[in-house]
Structure formats: structure tokens, C-alpha cells
Amino acid sequence: VKPGRHFEPGPIFHCRSLAALLSEASLCVSASLREYSISILLGLLSVTSVSAQTWDTGGYLKYRFQYASYPSDSYTSFLAGSSTADNALAFRYNLGVRHKGWDAWADYQFQALYGDTIEFSRDIPDLPVLPDRLPDDDHRLFDLTHVITDVDKRAALHRLDRLSAGYTTDQTVIRFGRQAISWGNGMIFTPMDFFNPFDPAAIDKEYKTGDDMLYGQYLQSNGNDLQGVWVIRRDDYGNVTSEVDSIALKYHGFVSDAEYDILAARHFEDLTLGGGAIFNLGGGVLRGDLMLTATADDTVFSGVASYSYSWVWWNKNISGVAEVFYNGFGQPNGDYSPESLAENEDLIERIARGELFTLGREYLALSAMIEMTPLWILTPNAFINLSDGSALVQVVSQHDIAQDWQILLAANLPIGSRGTEYGGIETGIEVGGEPTYLSTNWSFTFQLAWYF
């Protein structure tokens, strides 16, 4: 389990295991989802005559291998041994059609997993600081995910990550269905982007997970715009209720060479106000967001500010960013004991919903994107918890090896003593009378992607 909650099961495909899994997947595809997908495609075809349509297609096929090493007092070490090896195969096909102002989109995903993590994660207790083992739509309006198989070391599923229809004019956009939006000015930490944000330490940030929502935008003649969303969800009992939905408005404007954002939202049952700005400073860009959330018990402040700058060093183009983040929902004084975390319901709820990925309050993130060659980008990152002194050091290497082919390599090294966020928080579970931790020695990831 990687500190910071980024936990992506991914599998070890022996050729025979992969062939068996794909064969099983082809035989077990859900009839209901298959029929639903066919009806979507027929609906897209019926938008208008074929000659008048504009079609957009694309996608990828990705293979990922992940290896992780664990210390002897890690709870994962007790379940799976001193190391885990996992592989994942991911296929995505994006289909869109446009006619005059109308458009419709359907993005299909298939994932096949084989490895140690899929197997041992079934035995992990329901810890709120860990994400779901597999993607699901339990709390979304539409259930567009079907798990084909989940047994032993293998799992497979398919889903529709986008499914929406919309209408666009010169000044307005209206769209309903499964889609994704990104708000806020944070480069690494994103407190204003509370709709399925990326984990700051995620290696592949190509697609956000979609949510079922009604989205609208009005563009003014001066370039300013107003966006509004209504994200519709189901509660734990499957009921559609306003207690778990989100309604938000965000105004984006320009003043001279600066930009600003103003946000007002009701997210679940909390009221949120926010503001952000971007402007040039000293040859670089200064940006940030401030958020104020009124919960049932308190008013919580969060904020992020970053400075990015580009330069040339040793004939290499470099773009660097330094970002500070204050998480008002985080644990004070670096106390991450199970008892203390259990008392912080606001934090635990946001981690469980995938809105936050940090346990503490004060953070510093440093990142530099170095263009080693036009086809090789090297990115060292550091995520530092200023409250407890722990950190996660990460190096990502991106290689464009051929037309439409890309390799990603990444190494993660957590630093910190036991009881700290990145050094390993205590699970509250004892093995042989000794405490266990959510800790990792180091991990390595390899990903090969083909785009079409």
C-alpha cells in the first residue's frame, strides 16, 4: 500500500494466465451492458444522416507492471510477503459524433488484472484511507460498470467512463451524462477540484474518472465564462438524494494579464466558497486557490499556492514548480493513530470519496520537468509533509519510442519514521503482538502504451 493513498492494483501476466483471463472475459461479458452499449451506438447513429456527421474516434491499449517491496512490519508483508508483483492491461475506445451543435460521446474501458495485489487485497479490512479494490458505480446515478471475474490473482471488468449528449452554440454549452470536469489552479494539490481529482503522486493522469452530471457553460463576449454543474449520486441504499449530490457554480474572468475564479457550491451537505487567481510574476507564473467550507460542526479553510518557472540549463529545457498546500481537514500535529483518525470524520469521508489524498495539514511539493531530448522527458518530484517531516520522492521518465508508442517508468521512495504519513501509519492491527503499518520500502512501475 503506497503512502498517500495511491493504490493501483495491477497484475503479473504469464502468457497462459493472460490468455485464459481474456478468454473468460470474452465469454462472461454482461449481456445488459453489451445491449446498453449497442443501444448507445444506435442512438449515436440516429443523430442525423451519416453524410452530415463528424465522427471522433481514438483510444489506447496499455500494459502496466508494478513491483513493490515492503518492510517486515508492513501489514502488506504479513498478507503477501516481502514484495508484490502485479500487471494490468487496459483498453480504452473513445467514440464521439457531432452534427451542427449537437454531440454525443461514449468511452468504453476494459481492464484485466493479474497479480499479488488483487489476491491479498481481498483480506484487507475496510480501512477508509484505502480506495476501492476495483472501480464501481455504486454511488453514481447510472451503473455502467460490470465486473466480469474476480477470483484468486485475477480480475477483469469493463465499463463506460464517458456517456453524454450535449448541445453547443457560440456562447452556451449544455451537456448531460457521464463526463469529467477539472477546476482550480493547483498544479499538484487541487482543493478546488473536488470532482474525482487526481492523486498528486499518480503516474498516469491522462483521463479523470467520469461522473454523472448536468453541465452548463455561458461564455461572455469579453472571454469571461460561467460554469455550473449538478452531480447526481446515490446514497449507500441506492437512493438518489440531495444529501449526496453536488451543485456548483464557478465564474472565470480576466483582468489585464491576470485571471481569476469565484466558486460557490453545495457539496454533499457542506457549503463551500472559493476563489483563485493566476498572474505573471518575475518571468514565471504565480497561481493559487483559497477554499472555505462550512461543515455541520466547523468552518474549514484550505488553500494552495504555486510558482512555476521555465529556464534552460546545460542546453536542457526545464520547467519547475514549487507548491505549498494547506489542508484544513488534515490531522493537526501529525497524529495519524487509528483512534485520532477515526475522530476526524470530515477527513475520512473525503479520503473515502477520493477527494483528498493527504492526511496532514501542511505540504510542500517540488517538481521539475526536464527535456533530456525531444522524445525523453525526465520528471523528479518530491511531496513533503511539513508537519511530520516525512516525504515521498518520485522520479518519472517518459519516452516516446515511436509514432503512437510511449513508455513510462517511475520509481517511488517513501522517507520517514514509523507513524508518519509517508513512513507508514499504524493500522491498529497487531500481528504476533506487534503493531503493523501501511508502509512501503520502494516501488517501481513500467507502462507501455499504444495510441490509436
Regions found by a protein language model. Give the residues of each.
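Transmembrane beta-strand segments of Gram-negative outer membrane beta-barrel proteins
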Residues: Q53-L79, A104-A106, N224
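Transmembrane beta-barrel strands of outer-membrane/channel proteins
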Residues: G59-Y67, A106-A112, F176-R178, G228-I232, ...
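Residues that define the transmembrane beta-barrel architecture of outer-membrane proteins
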Residues: S83-F91, A156-D161, T168, K208-D212, ...
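Residues on the lipid-exposed face of transmembrane beta-strands in outer-membrane beta-barrel proteins
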Residues: F91-V97, R162-Y167, L214-Y218, L249-G253, ...
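Repeated loop/turn-to-beta-strand initiation elements of outer-membrane beta-barrel proteins
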Residues: G101-A104, Q171-I174, G223-L226, V255-I262, ...
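Detector for outer-membrane/organellar transmembrane beta-barrel domains
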Residues: G284-F383
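Outer-membrane beta-barrel "beta-signal"
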Residues: T436-F452
